[in-house]
């Protein structure tokens, strides 16, 4: 009985993953087929070797920004190298039992770059949604907006109308039923309208040509020391993103099925998935929260569901891929507009801006703007360093050195004197509280004595940690 549920759930999740995989691949600057390759190859290894029984892997919106930047700078081969490197890093993290360390990435950083990715993804769909007649879209955010403004007069009203129809379906369909994804219905309806009415709207086929229906083939990219050196930072960022999103997805699914995932095994599964995704022409992948949740809601409880999802996508690749060339580009843009809207947790973002400590707000806003105006690699690097520095400053401010008073001092009341220990004036007692580390080392300077002092007692029972400083 459970086997049948897993198989049916895998088929449903494959239907959900199909339009998303194609749309995310196009938004990342690669061919639509590469999105399916990723969902098939990486999805299989993530389900088979991962530490969660119900995890569904594949391309996600979190990678769009960094993939687009890598493809623009280093081409497809550079992306493959970065994907394989990220997979190796993930495997090393899993083997070194770093699964629990992902929780040390501050919430302000994940919220900041997630909202930044959402804005970048949203803006990146404007060309296809409006049907603008323009060349390649610049990778930089400001230049992108300038290019849109310069070509806004080339907007295609028919394209906008089809995109609007897709948006309406995507927004209203979940209120009708959640058995079939709104993205699939939007694609079927708008594709039929454009095809039978012969409307002048760009489709996947008109932009990318005929799509391949062949299985992915093994391809070993050309590695060089210089390329590896240049891509180590983007690869590390991909690995961190994959680790965060996959473990978050695993935690969410644990709550839904009453299970506990193995975080280190999950990282190894993610690593193998990315290594083989790169070797078979795919892009970076991770556990997808929405697809994993859909798997659980439809009865999936074992890795069979994830493997069935991969097999179903393989069949679709071989049998139905030529039909995918008929899908309007504006429909895929509409799908990603909704994805961008849903992934951005603006409620948490503005709540943190209002209520979080000033240091946390600085990290949040800095990570957000760096993601939008520079790139995700810079945003995460600066965000982590900034969060660490501000946290150390906060901890240093909690460290304090207090000198004990003598019972016969003028400002000591009789009631206080009764509770105090009677110690001779030749002994000075200092009490240190808070962590004593390099940023708080100056507090030691508060320990002073006069000529009458023969003994200094330093009480450190309130010091939770101390370093070599």
Residue ranges, per PLM feature:
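Structured cytosolic domains appended to multi-pass membrane proteins
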Residues: 403-406, 411-469
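Transmembrane helical cores of multi-pass ion-transport proteins
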Residues: 1-408
């Amino acid at each position: 009985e459970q086997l049948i549920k897993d198989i049916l759930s895998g088929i449903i999740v494959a239907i959900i993953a199909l339009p998303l995989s194609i749309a995310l691949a196009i938004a990342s600057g690669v061919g639509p087929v590469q999105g399916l390759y990723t969902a098939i190859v990486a999805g299989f290894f993530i389900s088979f070797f991962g530490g969660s029984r119900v995890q569904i892997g594949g391309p996600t919106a979190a990678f769009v920004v960094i993939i687009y930047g890598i493809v623009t700078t280093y081409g497809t081969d550079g992306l493959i190298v970065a994907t394989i490197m990220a997979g190796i890093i993930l495997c090393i993290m899993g083997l070194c039992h770093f699964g629990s360390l992902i929780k040390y990435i501050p919430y302000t950083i994940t919220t900041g770059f997630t909202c930044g990715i959402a804005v970048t993804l949203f803006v990146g769909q404007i060309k296809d949604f409006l049907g603008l007649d323009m060349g390649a879209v610049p990778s930089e955010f400001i230049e992108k907006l300038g290019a849109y403004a310069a070509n806004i007069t080339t907007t295609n009203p028919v394209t906008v109308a089809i995109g609007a129809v897709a948006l309406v379906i995507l927004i209203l369909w979940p209120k009708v039923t959640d058995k079939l994804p709104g993205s699939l219905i939007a694609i079927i309806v708008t594709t039929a309208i454009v095809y039978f009415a012969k409307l002048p709207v760009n489709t996947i086929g008109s932009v990318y040509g005929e799509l391949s229906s062949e299985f992915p083939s093994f391809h070993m990219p050309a590695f060089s020391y210089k390329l590896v050196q240049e891509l180590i930072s983007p690869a590390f960022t991909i690995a961190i993103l994959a680790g965060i999103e996959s473990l978050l997805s695993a935690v969410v699914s644990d709550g839904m099925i009453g299970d506990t995932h193995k975080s280190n095994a999950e990282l190894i599964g993610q690593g193998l998935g990315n290594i083989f995704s790169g070797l078979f022409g795919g892009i970076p992948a991770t556990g997808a929260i929405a697809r994993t949740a859909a798997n659980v809601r439809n009865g999936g409880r074992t890795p069979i569901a994830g493997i069935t999802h991969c097999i179903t996508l393989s069949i679709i690749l071989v049998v139905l891929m030529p039909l995918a060339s008929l899908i309007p580009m504006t429909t895929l843009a509409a799908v990603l507009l909704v994805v961008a809207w849903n992934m951005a947790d603006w409620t948490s973002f503005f709540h943190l801006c209002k209520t979080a400590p000033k240091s946390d707000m600085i990290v949040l806003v800095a990570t957000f703007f760096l993601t939008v105006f520079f790139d995700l690699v810079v945003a995460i690097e600066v965000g982590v360093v900034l969060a660490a520095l501000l946290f150390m400053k906060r901890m240093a401010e909690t460290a304090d050195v207090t000198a004990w008073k003598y019972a016969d001092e003028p400002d000591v009341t009789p009631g206080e004197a009764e509770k105090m220990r009677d110690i001779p004036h030749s002994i000075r007692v200092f009490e240190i509280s808070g962590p004593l580390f390099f940023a708080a080392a100056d507090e030691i300077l508060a320990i002073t004595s006069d000529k009458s002092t023969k003994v200094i007692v330093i009480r450190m029972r309130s010091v939770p940690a101390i370093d070599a400083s």
